[in-house]
Amino acid sequence: FLHSSKSTSTLASCAAVLAAKAIPIIAEVDNSLTIDPIDLENKITPQTKAVIPVHMRGVPCNMDQVLSIAKKHNLKVIEDVAQACGGSYKGKYLGSFGDCNAFSFQFHKIITAGEGGMVTTDNDLYFDRAQAYHDTAACWRPGGPAKRFASARYQGELFPGVNFRMSELIGAVMLAQLHKLDGIISKMRKNKSRIKNGISDIHGIELRHVHDSAGDTGISLVFFLENGPLAEKFAKALKAEGIEASSIFNKGIPD
């Protein structure tokens, strides 16, 4: 599994790969701080099975190139949309490009029910697998739990599952949150645009590149300064003014 750099991404994506008894291979990021297609292709080996583009901090990866590389090497694509729910790439929603796509509704995501998440796919087999895995694999056999000793639904595909079922209460909250998503995204985009216009003439600030600015969720404003100490000093000054800011994963050292 190929995954964007740990120093600018999150452990959860790698942990999911390890939980599947696979080995995550870390790819570098480009100046958007999302997966670098050039390094992605350089890291592919005969053992590579899938690529996980992480739409980090609300902006889309370069999906044209990611999908092209995946098709060339016959790889599955698993989008990590945890921080970019509601974002898009060239007019198409993030989370609709991959073979499977993962969303998070944890408490500091764009919309939340406190915890929980969602998997989307347009592949019937993958849907059935996900449904079974999250529900102790009981529904994997025809007839569900009542016929747990029936033959396998798909030949040669019996496996243990876990309990990742979302409660009805959290599901109801999330349905209400989904109706608010467009309004939340719109407000964040307007706020980000105002800030960008306000700092456009400040020397030394280089805004992060965004592969499709129209699809940016607006959840964060990321820019580069000359060095790490200056970035930390800058963040401290912003915090003193009541503006939440930090350098990315302070002192984080990838293994």
Explain the meaning of each model-derived region.
Residues 56, 178, 223-227:
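Conserved donor-binding loops in enzymes that form glycosidic bonds
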Residues 1, 25, 77-78, 102, ...:
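Structural detector of well-ordered beta-strand residues that form the stable sheet scaffold
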Residues 1-84, 88:
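PLP-dependent aminotransferase-like
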